[in-house]
Amino acid sequence: MKIRQQRTIEKNICKKMILLSFCMILMVSMAGCGNKRKENLTITNVSYDPTREFYEKYNKDFIKYYKDKYGKKVEVIQSHGGSGSQARSVVEGSNGDVVTLALEHDISLIEQTGLINKGWQKRFSNDSAPYTSMIVFLVRKGNKKSIKDWKDLIKKGVEVITPDPKSSGGACWNFLAAYGYAIDTYHDQKKEEQFLTKLYQNVSVMDSGARGSTTTFVENKKGDVLIAWENEAIQTVKNYPDKYEIITPSISILAQPSVSLVDDNVKVNGTKKIATEYLKYLYSDKAQKLAAEEGYRPSNETILKQYQGKFNLNMKLYKISDFGGWDQAYKKYFEDGALFDKIYTNQ
């Protein structure tokens, strides 16, 4: 009886040792898999419409930089669309590690959900705006409608193309640039709003994003003038030098696209280090020069001056602070029932 019990005990001990050995092998195997995943880090950049070409080139530079510095291979997935729509996609569960959106307000909407930490604007230089732009007009070669300034956009028979401020960050900048001109010209709120009403009465197609509006104007041949990001207009003229030209209005606005980590996502994904490096590298000299070559205005003033032949650095530019900052401006002009809705529903 004792011998039988002893054998049973030995069998149980043997089973436990086998089970323990199996668990240890499994843990080592899983650790090995984890290391492999770390060797091929993947992040997703949720961005707005016209940045596609810039980030395609930037990502290649960054991947090389990260490999040279850390010896690790990185993959960057790009996602593009209207800035407001992209912000909502992150709020609704899109697994972006970083957001590079058209305006601060879109990132603040994500911040309000707790996905992005408060104070994100101060995480990187220049209020987390590594590059800027402004708003210009793109017309067909020859400029048959003689469009020279904002006042020409309200003429009878002029068809204007601009995206929808409800989904496009660029469209919000377009609206505010036009409003800046109206403020300087009329000095009367009623007349300013009448000007904006006439302008939007001339809008024939209103796409959901800036790239969609460019496609409508360039590929579908709709409209006489496109209100556009300066960088988008520069790229279009570069691609079609004999078909389009840029008109710089007398007054525009300093458009500041913003960038941020999506803090909750990078924590879950284990990508905080790579995502932080990704955004920091936007401020490197190489990335700043690339931004300039792609039509964006570098935040580095020294590098910006090197491209002064490409950009008009002496024109009057309104700033978002002139409209009370984004929180105030969005409530006043773009929320449901605000000024844009009143203007657009009066048509």
Protein language model annotation of sequence segments:
Residues 142-148, 167, 180-188, 265-273:
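Short helix-loop capping/hinge motifs at secondary-structure junctions, enriched
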Residues 37-167, 314, 344-345:
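N-terminal segment of the mature folded domain
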Residues 46-48, 139-141, 158-185, 199-203, ...:
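Short beta-strand->loop
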Residues 129-136, 196-200, 207-208, 239-272:
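Periplasmic-binding protein-like
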Residues 185-250:
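Ligand-binding pocket segment of bilobal, Venus flytrap-like solute-binding proteins
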Residues 3-20:
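Bacterial N-terminal signal peptides that target proteins for export
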Residues 266-347:
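Extracellular/periplasmic juxtamembrane helices and adjacent flexible linkers that interface
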Residues 28-32:
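C-terminal motif of bacterial Sec signal peptides marking the signal peptidase cleavage site
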